[in-house]
Structures are given as structure tokens and as C-alpha cells.
Amino acid sequence: MEHLIHYTWKHKIFPLQELRTTEGLLVEVINPGLANTHDGPDFIGASIKIDGTLWSGNVEIHIKSSDWFRHHHDRDSNYDNVILHVASIIDCPIYYPNGQEIPQLQLSVPQHVINNYDMLTRRDSLPRCKDVLSTLPTITIHNWMTTLTLERFALRTQQILARRDSLNKNWEDTLFITIARNFGFGINGNAFEQWAQSIPMGAVGKHRDSIFQIEAIFFGQAGLLEGTMHDTYSSNLQKEYLYLQQKFSLTPISRKTWKFLHLRPQNFPHIRIAQLASIYYQQKLTLSSLLNAHSIEAITHLLTTDVSEYWRTHYTFDGPPSASATRKLSPTSIDLIAINSVAPMLFAYGKYKSDQDLCDQAFDLWQNIKPEKNNITRNWASAGIICENAADSQAIIQQTRQYCQTRDCLRCAFGYEYIKCTPDLLREQEVRNE
């Protein structure tokens, strides 16, 4: 219950009647303060008028006023600047060190807030707050979506910088692994990252002028050159890998790491690895070229490459030949790589270099790419939140994974709009949405 008292105070969801202290003094909340995530009072920097006098300081919140003593705040100097103690149940007075009584406000959580929060936490279908989404002002949606987009970039930046730290702070290796992970397109993302991490890029760089040797290392490290090979190309590739494996002390990942079920042939790991080998061989996708890619067209140029001759007629080593065809990345695949790898890399590098222009470049890139189409974006579209670009779809993914799936409605702007709704307004919206 205390978290709902916090919420009620933070958002000033107060009863219609006047607020008064236990001594009958009129309370006017000018600013509830900022939630404190460190030791000390729950809210800091509050501004409150008590009996006409403006006070600035901190606010502490409990279920019972006696919790003040149970938590030993009476012996903690961090609480000496508390100007108001808020509790649902006032069962005792509390005092400053000098013996003066601390003003207390009895604040009950409105019943509709309790009911609405309970409904949100019990409802399974997403988005849980769909009944109010269609009524929200455009500015409310825009502001929250912008916040979610920045949160998404921050999360990706944290992941990329952690990856870089594990790679001796090498940005080129970080780029390769980040791009490689995205070539798994969800299903094989972890496998591609594990595979890319197994490849010593310094060693591969010594053979970058040979697509055959690059493919030998790439496929060998993927565990896909084990067993009997049935044609000249794959047999020679296996022999080359065994030589390079001994030369560089390479340890491949297990072939069982890869998933093939429900994949179309053009999405098989073999094809994706062949595409990566070709991109790496052509040396177009480097950190330098990435930093100069200011549009999706420029990124498309960096990622547009065909596979070597063998892979134009094969999907695996052991499968029958197919009709010759190009195996270039599709426009949709390039968009996804730009969304999930290129833009986050630009943003992370911009943060690392304190270069706001690079961060803006990443943000602009998302805003100029078509939105992703998946179950998450379709669910939100049916509730009235339409994604106009990739920044929007990434915001909705952030919303779903970091707020909806964790039921963290109290930190969510959409959740706030639902929770504060009175019963009459909520029923009205439910009827409209039926």
C-alpha cells in the first residue's frame, strides 16, 4: 500500500476536500518534491504551505506514523529537514530532535486509484490501459513516446558499452559483434553474438584480402564445417579452416547453437554468415564509414553486397543446389539492422565522445526509417497508438518490455492516465471502445 501512497502524493491525486494536518492546519502542496532514490526522506525539495507559511524541504511517507520510529528515523539526521510526514494511518505524534512536533498529514489513497491499479495488475492482455489511450492529448502521447525513445537508446548504449569493455575497448570489434548479433534477426541473435565473440578479429584481419579464407574462419567458427563434406568447395573450405584453426588456436562454437526450425532458407545461418563474410571482405562497413552514414540510403550502400558464388546456388553445405539467385539483404532486413545496430552504435559512440551531433544523427535515422511491423506494434495500433517511424516502434517496444511486461504501471505515463481516471470516466471509455 505504501507505494500507492507514494504515487498519490507524487501525482497530487488528492481528495476534493481541503488537506489539513492532524492539528487542523491548512495544507497546500505547491510542489510534492522529487522522488528520492537514495538514503533519506522519500521526497526532496518539496514546497508546501502550512497554515499560510511556505516551507521548503523534504517529505517522508509511511503507512502508519509509528513507522517513523520503527524505521529509526528519529535517530537519523537525514530526516531532520522533513517539513511534513504523510501517512495513511496517524497513530502517534513524531518530533524533531529539539522536541518540536513534526506536522503530519493523514492521506488515504482514493478508492478509484486502488481499483484502477488493481485492474491494471490483473489484466493480461496488452496494452492493459487501452481503454484510455484513444482519449489522450497528442502532446501527452508525443512527450511519453520521446521519453521512451531516449530510454531505448540509453538501454542500447549501456549494452554496447558493456560489450566494448569486454573487448578491450575496441570499437571496430564492438561494431562487428553488434552487427553480427542483428543478423540473427531475433531467433539466432544470441547464437550470432556467441559466434562473433569466438572470432579473433585481429587474426581474421590478416586474411581480409581473401574471401575464401574469411569464409573458412567464419563457417568453421560457427561449427558448420564438421563432418564429411560432399562437394569440392565445402571440402576445400574445411581443409583451409583446419589449417587456420591450428594457426590461430581457434575454438568453434557448437553447431547445435543454431536454430533452423521455422526459418525460411534465405534466413538460414549459412546465408547470413556468407553475407557477413562478404561485407567484411569488402571493408565497406567500418566505424569510420558508419559515422559518415547520415541516411538510410547511405547505410543501404554499406550493407548491399552479394554472397560468393557458391552461396548463390546453396542454402547449406549438405543441401542440393538451387537455382542461381542473388542473396542480398532485403530492404526490410537492412532497415532492421539500421534500427537495431547502426543507430544504437552511433548513439553509443556519440555518448562516449560527448558528441551530441552523433546522438542526433542516430535519432534522425530512427525517425526516417519505416516502423517495425510485429505483434507488439500491431497490438498498440489496435489500441490507437500508430507508429509513424522506427523511433515510434522502438518506443513501443521499450514500453512493452520495460513497463507492460514487468507490470510497472506506476512509472508509466499511460498507466498514470488510467490510474487517475474516475469510475465514470473509465466506464465511459470502456463503452466507447466496445
Language-model-derived ranges and their functions:
Residues Y7-S66, Y79:
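N-terminal ordered "arm"
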Residues T53-K64, I83-A87, R401-K420:
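Hydrophobic/aromatic-rich, well-ordered segments within soluble, folded domains that form packed cores
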Residues S382-E434:
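Acidic, carboxylate-rich catalytic segments that either coordinate divalent cations
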Residues D80-V82, V86-N143:
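Compact, glycine/acidic-enriched structural inserts
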